[in-house]
Each structure stands twice: as structure tokens, then as C-alpha cells.
Amino acid sequence: MNFKLGYIQGRFVSLINEKIQAYPEKEWKKDLSIASKNGFSNVELTLDLDKIYETPLLNSGNDILKNELYKRNINAVAVTADFFMQSLPWQKNNNGLEELSKIVKDVILNMHNLGIRILVLPFVDESSLDQKDIPKAISFLSKLTTTLKNSNVKIAIESDFEPNLL
């Protein structure tokens, strides 16, 4: 049998601020190398808000990321937007909402450029939705429709909602 193993970025290197899931800013290449050597062929990239435009996905050098993935024979299948947990759109004023919307659109466009098709939005833990937040979350996501269609990127929602509320 030929299995294609995948992992979430950062699992093969040191914890960041004692968190198991965080973008490994200083060790992202090492993380890919270790994953490749251990038979992993798929990765879900992680994006935190801190220095988000300095990550290889969003900076002008996303060719660096593309080349590293190619060299390691690893396919980036998704991006987890952990920055959502650090900057909740439904708790923003209009300026903050526009800034976050720009970040999300930039992420989607760069995902498209690299052929990554799934953006995971975490609505769990710190970013869990209250009933009152649902309309704001729907409104925020609705404004991404054109960008998503044009880029062929889909959103996957990680949620702690009861199934009947999803």
C-alpha cells in the first residue's frame, strides 16, 4: 500500500512559546526536511499573526517556499489561519476588520499562487463563536466570496459547535 502521510507544520521542531501549533519561524525549513526524511508528503501550513508578512507564504519570496516544498517532495494541501485566533474579526471595529480582511485576501491569493486549495479557519478555543457572533462571522466570510471563487480556494471551518448548529 502507498500511503500519503500529512502533518501540521511545526510538529517536527521546537515548540514556540510552549505551543504545539505555531508557525516555526526560525525552523520551518528544518521542519520540512525532517518531515520529508520521515515519509511525510503533505503539510498543512500554519500562519500566526505575528510577522505574518514575513512568512514565506506571504512575503515576496514565496518562491522560496515553493522551492523548499518541491525539493522535499512535499505538497502543501492547506493553510491553517491561526491568526484568526489572535485577531477575531467579530471583535474588530471597521478599521481592524478591513485590515484583517486584507490579510485573509492576501493569504488566499498567495495560496492560489502556490496551488494550495484549503484555508482552515479555526472557530475553536480563543476564537470560538458565541451565538451573538454568528451574524458577524457570516458577514465577514461572505465578503470573501469573490476572492475565494477567483482563486479556487475553499474554506474549511474548525468548530466546536454542536453538529446541528453547523
Outline where the language-model segments fall.
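N-terminal pre-domain/capping segments
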Residues: 1-106, 112
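Active-site acidic/histidine proton-transfer and metal-coordination neighborhood
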Residues: 26-29, 68-72, 87-166
